[in-house]
Amino acid sequence: MKRLVSTLNLPKEDWLRYRKCGITGTDAGAILGLNPYRSAFQVYHDKISDTIENIDNEAMRQGRDLEDYVAQRFSEATGLKVRRANAIYQSEEHPLLLADFDRLIVGQKAGLECKTVSPFSADKWADGKIPAHYLAQVDHYLAVSGFDCWYVAALIFGREMVIHKIVTDKQVLSDLIDKEELFWTRHVVPQIPPAPNGCDSDTQKINQLYEVDDRDKTADLSALHGLLDKRQELSDQIEQMEQEKTAIEQQVKLQMQDAAYGTAPGYKVSWVSSESKRVDSQRLRKEQPDIFNQYSKNVSSRRFTIVHAA
């Protein structure tokens, strides 16, 4: 591998722009369909767009702030010294593959990925498990670096520090490289998007791409007739299953009667009263129109409906 660019004093916008030039570790799980928060559809649109999306949130901020601490705890637990990479690296054999490493292990052909984990996600790390999209990220780093192994140190807030060692598997890396390069040549280069996978974030992206409708335009969807039939079939199945689910809930309520709680092997059930106050918007608009208008705002969205014409 080679250093593509130093990240010391590199503005974040420039750093994000460099990452558009190839496939990074965080792209790997999404391309493989393993990332619950990001899809190949989103990776594609990020790569072809000139827009730099500087997305940040509290979880990402905490992850950055605690990276030093996680690396320190890793060194304490293993006795291995680590150092910052301070660069975007590029595979010389497969130049499409880029990587930002959290840490490199001093004196070894190895690296370290630092993670911070919510206690609500602790089960995903139980019994030696690693979330699949993180494992894909590490395999990507092994593919870029050519190193022998990679460590993952995960701080589960308030619980424990988990450390895993991932050893290079040449067949796994070969398969990963093939899929990443295929994604690039099949989708990014010809600018043909991959199919969305049904996740909420794909819906948000599609709505963002096409915010405004043209009332004078009607699309011919004949080529999607089979998909529309499949959707109708699924909708009918879901409706039937929802009714069956509701019938079971009704039986449980009849058994509980006025009990607030119920138990069964492997289950805890609650049926408790609650009160909430809601604004009567119709009355407010009628009796206090000035106040209603003062605290109202226009929200624009496109309503999507499919009606089956029998």
Predicted regions and their residues:
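Accessory terminal regions of nucleic-acid processing enzymes
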Residues: 1-310
